[in-house]
Design a protein with these regions (language model features):
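C-terminal accessory module of base-excision DNA glycosylases/AP lyases that mediates lesion recognition
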Residues: 1-29, 114, 119-120, 133-142, ...
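A general alpha-helix detector
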Residues: 41-46, 62, 78-82, 120-124, ...
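Alpha-helical ds-nucleic-acid-binding substructure associated with the helix-hairpin-helix region
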Residues: 16-19, 51-52, 56-127, 182-184
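Histidine/lysine/aspartate-rich catalytic loop segments that bind and position anionic ligands
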Residues: 105, 128, 144-148
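Residue-level marker of regulatory loop/turn positions in helix-turn-helix DNA-binding domains and
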Residues: 36, 40, 114-117, 128, ...
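A positional/architectural concept
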Residues: 8, 15-61, 65-68
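Structural motif
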Residues: 32-40, 87-91, 180-187
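Short alpha-helical scaffolding segments that buttress acidic/His motifs in well-ordered protein cores
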Residues: 42-47, 96-100, 139, 190-194
Length: 205
C-alpha cells in the first residue's frame, strides 16, 4: 500500500532538492510499500539489520516459506537449527523469539499501536532485546507510516548521501541537519529514494 503522503512528498522534494529530483524521475512509478502486518514488519527489520538488501531479501524469502502462517506462536515452535538454515545468525534468532514473545504478551498494545503517540511506541519497543533505534525507525517508516524518518544510523542512507552529495564519511552533523531541515516533513520519501539509488531492488520491511 502506498503511503498517503507519497505523491505530495515527491513533488515537495523535487522542488527543493535537485539531486533527489533526478532520482525520483528515474523511478517514477515506484514507491515505499507499507506493511500493515506489524509483526512481520518488525521481523523483517531484524532480518535486515547490518546486511545488504539482496541478502535480506533472500533470507526473508526462506524464513516466510517455513510456515504458511507466520505468527508469534508458530515462530516460537520453530527449532533454532531450522532458522539457521534460512541464513539467520543465532543472535537474530534470539531477537526474533524476543519479538514473538512481546507480541504474545502485549496483544492490547499491538492491536491499538497506530493510535499511540510515537514516543510511547518507541518507549515500548526499545525494551525488546534486539530492537534498537534503527529497527524502530524502520518500523515507523514501513508500518506506522511516519512521513519524516531521517535514519542517520543507517549505513546505506549515509553511503547514499556521501555518494550523491559528494561528502566524505563521517558526514558532519551540521550538514545532515541541513538535509533533514530541507527534506522535512518528507524525509521518509527522501530516505527511500536514496536507498533506491543504491540497490537493484526496492527496500521493503
Amino acid at each position: 500500500m502506498k503511503p498517503k503522503y507519497w505523491n505530495k512528498g515527491k513533488s515537495y522534494l523535487s522542488n527543493n532538492d535537485t539531486v533527489l529530483k533526478l532520482i525520483i524521475e528515474k523511478f517514477p512509478d515506484e514507491y515505499l510499500k507499507l506493511n500493515a502486518n506489524f509483526y512481520h514488519a518488525l521481523l523483517n527489520s531484524i532480518i535486515g539489520q547490518q546486511i545488504s538488501v539482496s541478502a535480506a531479501s533472500s533470507i526473508k524469502k526462506k524464513f516466510f516459506n517455513l510456515n504458511k502462517n507466520i505468527k508469534p506462536s508458530n515462530v516460537l515452535k520453530l527449532n533454532e537449527n531450522i532458522l539457521k538454515l534460512c541464513g539467520l545468525s543465532r543472535q537474530k534468532i534470539l531477537y526474533i523469539y524476543n519479538i514473538s514473545n512481546f507480541f504474545l504478551e502485549n496483544k492490547k498494545f499491538i492491536a491499538n499501536i497506530d493510535l499511540y503517540d510515537e514516543v510511547i511506541i518507541k518507549e515500548k519497543l526499545i525494551n525488546i532485546k534486539g530492537v534498537g533505534n534503527w529497527t524502530i525507525d524502520m518500523f515507523l517508516l514501513f508500518s506506522i507510516g511516519n512521513s519524516n524518518i531521517f535514519p542517520c544510523g543507517d549505513l546505506g542512507f549515509i553511503k547514499a548521501i556521501s555518494k550523491l552529495y559528494k561528502k566524505e564519511i563521517p558526514i558532519k552533523e551540521a550538514y545532515l541537519n541541513r538535509l533533514k531541515k530541507r527534506w522535512s516533513p518528507y524525509s521518509s520519501v527522501a530516505t527511500w529514494y536514496l536507498w533506491r539509488s543504491l540497490d537493484p531492488i526496492p527496500v521493503s520491511y
